[in-house]
Structure formats: structure tokens, C-alpha cells
């Protein structure tokens, strides 16, 4: 199946991918994900929460632990309260029905010995309105990376010049590459991506090591080199964690 981006929207995705790979960051894919995440959180606590069709989805899916905190941090207290009230109503009604056995049945059991309530709570734990809003567009970004690598020689050079990737997104790139690339192009992509990951992980590891050295009196007069922000960059490499900019919050109140 052709997973290349469609025209029109494809141009938007290409701009986002180009911008991310042109930026000075430890993982351009994390950078793209963070932008999508910020937009999705703002959307959740923007005017959309008053729309019945959107509220029906947030009522059903709720939020993961990470995005529950981010939605709360928007500081739209009334909006958050309304969303939480109707979501809690939905959960209470669903679980009361399951406790009473009104909707329990074989379809509610993954295993014969698993309570219907457990199946429900596990399913609820695995859904998040914000995550699911991000995921579809994020996959299109990944497809665009492979499409541009295959067809755009300038982008290939930009890809090879980036600072590598976090561990999570490195693994995703290797997993999905064969869906879009074949033969020598696939081999080159894998080789390049492997090198980018290892070389840049070592660079950040060495910066962290120098950060540690600076706490030894033997190195007190030595320059910091690139170590001052090494812990923040290590968090990106190891945990795909990009902190919000200081003073920046999604405020939709």
C-alpha cells in the first residue's frame, strides 16, 4: 500500500518535517510530536469541549496520566471541570451496569475468568483522547519522512546531518522503514539511522560524563564545554522527554 502523503496536506507535512530536521534538537521526531501534543491539549481545552460530539469522545476515552496533567495545566478550570464531570458520569454508569450484570456477557470477557469490570478498566486505561488525536497525524509525519528520504536528495542530506534520535523513535524508524523503502535505499537508510543514533548517543553520554567531572575539584577550572544542558538533552535521548519552554503554558481560560 502506498503510504506517501496526499497532495495538499502532504505539503503541510513536508514543511513540518523539514522544519523539525532543520532545527537544533536532539530528536526531530520528538520535536514534531511535542508540537502535535501541544496543539491537541490546547484543542481539548479550547472551544471544542463545549461541542457535544467532542465531549462524547472525551467522556468515553478519558485521558492517560500524562495528558490528564497537561489538560489540567491549561488552567481552564471550568472547562476541565465540565469535561471531568461528564467523563466521571460515564465511568460510574458503565461500571454500575457491569456490577449489576446488565451488559455483562461473553463479549465483555477476554478470558473466562476475567471479571467484566476488569476488562472495562483495562480498556479505559488504554485510551486517551489526546493520544489518539496525536497518533493519526504523527503517523503521517513518519510516512512523510520516508517519502522525502526516498524522493528528495536535499532532505536526505538534511537527515544525515541531524543530531540523531531518542531511543524510542530510533526503534520506530527501523521498524517502519521497510514499509516505504526497499533494496539499496532501505539498506542505506538503516545504516545511516544506526550511525546517527549511536554516534549522537555517545556524544550526549560524553557530555553527561563531563558534567560529572565538573563536580570533581580536579576539573573546577576547566571549561564546561557542552555539558551544562547535558542532563536535559540526555532526558530527550533516553526518555523522549521535551520540557515545556520556561514560562510557556497552554492557557485557554
Regions found by a protein language model. Name each.
Residues 66-102, 113-115:
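Hydrophobic, ordered structural segments
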Residues 34, 63, 68-71, 135, ...:
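Cys/His-rich microdomains that often coordinate metals
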Residues 27-30, 128-131:
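Short cysteine-rich clusters marking metal-coordination/redox-active sites
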Residues 99-107, 127, 169, 185, ...:
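Long, charge-rich alpha-helical interaction segments
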Residues 1-13:
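Single conserved hydrophobic/aromatic residue that forms the stacking wall/gate
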Residues 20-23, 57-60, 121-124, 159-162:
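Short metal-coordination and nucleic-acid-contact micro-motifs, chiefly zinc-binding Cys/His arrays
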Residues 39-45, 74-81, 140-146, 176-182:
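Short cysteine/histidine-rich zinc-coordinating motifs and their immediately flanking basic loops
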Residues 32-55, 133-157:
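Short recognition patches in nucleic-acid-associated and regulatory proteins
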